[in-house]
Amino acid sequence: MDVRLDHLVCWVSDQLHSLHFYEQVIGLPGVRAEAFREGKAAFPSVRITAETILDLMTYDASMGVEESTGVKGSAGHPINHFCLAVGKEDFDELQVRLKQHGVEITGSGVNSFGAQGIASETMFFPDPDGNVLEVRYYE
């Protein structure tokens, strides 16, 4: 079986504010961003990889989630964090952008195990809604 991660849904309170954070601070390209701004899309997304996006959905949208998934308690079911792997140069540049935008790096580590083996360095920080992101690089 060939499986790929298609998308994640992140609950946010202000979609435009979150879109700005993920585009301008993190540096991820928007998907359907203009259509959302024009009222032609229910939610914006940002592209993580060629095959994976992060949907930015409002808490209000969670009301219909249990009905569509058929899983009791699935609306807003919490995750601990999600992790993005980048190159060393992008990692260093992101640290600068986070500081410029007043985003506190709340945790860090070295030699941390992940999907590609042992990451040289890793950092954790919250998005505007408190969703925790980890960013790391592998050498």
Predicted regions and their residues:
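Core segments of cupin and vicinal oxygen chelate
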Residues: 2, 10-54, 58-61
